[in-house]
Each structure stands twice: as C-alpha cells, then as structure tokens.
Amino acid sequence: MKNFAYLNGPKVVVIGGGTGLSTMLRGLKKYTHNITAIVTVADDGGGSGVLREDLGMLPPGDIRNCILALRNTEPTMEKLLQYRFTDGMLKGQSFGNLFLAAMNGISISFEEAVKKMSEVLAVSGKVLPVTLDDVKLKAKLKNGIVIDGESLIPKLQMKEKSPIERIFLEPKDAKPVKEALIDIMDADEIILGPGSLYTSIIPNLLVNDVCEAIEDSKAIKVYVCNIMTQPGETIGYDANAHVDALFLHGLKSLDYVIVNNGEIPYEYKDRYKEDMSQPVSYDVESFKQKGIKVIEKDVLAIRNNYIRHDEQKLAEILMGLLE
C-alpha cells in the first residue's frame, strides 16, 4: 500500500541545480514518486566542464546528483558513482560523470542517456535537462563588465566587486525539453531552489517557454530561499532581493517563499562571515505587498561543517502545502 501511495502521490516539479536541489529531492521522495527534477545544463566548471569540452556533451554533474538523490539502489552504488579519482589523468573526475558520458555515447540523445541511467538506478520520478541545446551562461555586472561562462561568474564578480545586474544565455533562443514543459503544466506544486540563485536556478528560467509554462500551470508555486548569502552571487541580498531577481529574469508570480528562522550557531556565523557570507534576512510585510506568503520555519541542518537545508523538515513543509 505504501508504494501505491508514493506512485499516486502529488505531482511535484523541482527546478534548479547544484547540491541544494539534490538534498531536497532526498526528502521529497519519501512522500511521492511523482517527482520531476528539471536541471540546468549551463555548468562549465570542474569535471563536468572537462567532459563538456572533451566530448561535446552536456554537463553531467548536476543531473548525476539528482539521479543519485532519487535512486533506489544499494548505498554502495551511490558511493561508486560519487567516487572521484585522486590521481592520474582522471584526477578530480567523478565516476558517475563518466558513467553518464558512456551512456550518452550509446544513446541517440543526452535526454535518452539520462532516462537510461535513471532506469538502471531505479529512480523514483524523473530527471530532465531543461534544454538539449549547448548553452553558455553569461553575466552582466552593474559596472558594465560581461562575464563569459558559469564557472567564472562568482570568481570575477568578487574580483570586480560589482553586483550582478542580470544573466543571460547564449544562444538566447534555447529550446526547452518538451517533457519538462508538460510536467510543469501538469504539476500540483512547482518548487524553485534551494541553490545558487544566478548559476543554478535562474538559468532554467531563461530557456524559452519555461516561465510561461510556470505561470500557466495551476500548481502552487514555491521558492525555497537559501539560508546564507553566496559570495560571488548574492552578497548583501535579503530574501526579497532573491525573489526580485527571479522576477527580473522572467518569473511572473509566486505563492510562497520558505525562509529559515532557525538559530545558526555563532561559530558557523563567524566562519561564514570570513567568506563574506551571512544569514539571509527577510521582510514579511514586503512579501505581503507582493501577494506572497512567507513560511518561517527552522529548516537548518549542519552537514560536514556546512550550513544546509534539512531535507526532512523541508519536505514536510512542502508536502503540507498540498493538504
């Protein structure tokens, strides 16, 4: 009966990338298997960037993490696919990236490769790239400088000490994966974040027709705000500024914003402060004026000495909105 309930659970679409998205997926899959993760393919750094350059494929890293978060296999399989080589020509590369690269080699498209890897790992729900186009992410800073490439944006923004004015994709007419649009339209709940605002979440909104599908969908629309500001992207931002950036880049409406009101231990505040990162503040009244409800909850977790969202608490809140 439990599996039946999962299979017939609410239809949830999550949009983003990075570790924040995969963390949340681990919590959500305990409540429903009707999950679609729509993932950015703008990454051009690290092991993903190397494979993108060498093999001409779309970056596998964020998609790999989402697949592993939704997998139903032995823990050893996740350890294997997350393993990073420490020596030789493959140093820094993850086996999971190579697995997906090999799957891409025997498939007619990257979309099919992702589906095949998902089948092998008995994924609950589905993982979709937002586009199959070879897109590059660029950022224009307020001082007029244009940064070329996702991996360079945080570094050069910090160097220039000028806020991000807006980001954009090249080509500007990137076509969405049709199945992603269908699932957005059919969803009960659409969740943006958590994750890097400019390099994980907003790139998805820049793909043609994605914002329009979100707006036309009858789903509840939720933004999960980051707990801490991010150097190179959101220094000095409060939650309202995060949402303003989403609207600036095409999002048209939100129903809820989830913010953390849990107490962050002083030692972590101090350590993050050294990197110019601080807790994200929020103004409930300002959100009310925009017609957005604020959910203030303790969603804080400390994992491996890093501040993260607690996937269980977050999933309970998100599922509670559908009751």
Curated annotation (Swiss-Prot):
One of its GO terms (molecular function) is LPPG:FO 2-phospho-L-lactate transferase activity. One of its GO terms (biological process) is regulation of cell shape. GO terms for cellular component: cytoplasm. Gene3D superfamilies: CofD-like domains. InterPro entries: CofD, CofD-like_dom_sf, Gluconeogen_factor. It is found in: Cytoplasm. Keywords: Cytoplasm. Pfam families: CofD (PF01933). Belongs to the gluconeogenesis factor family. Required for morphogenesis under gluconeogenic growth conditions. NCBIfam families: CofD_related. This is Putative gluconeogenesis factor. It comes from Thermoanaerobacterium thermosulfurigenes. The lineage of its organism: Bacteria, Bacillati, Bacillota, Clostridia, Thermoanaerobacterales.
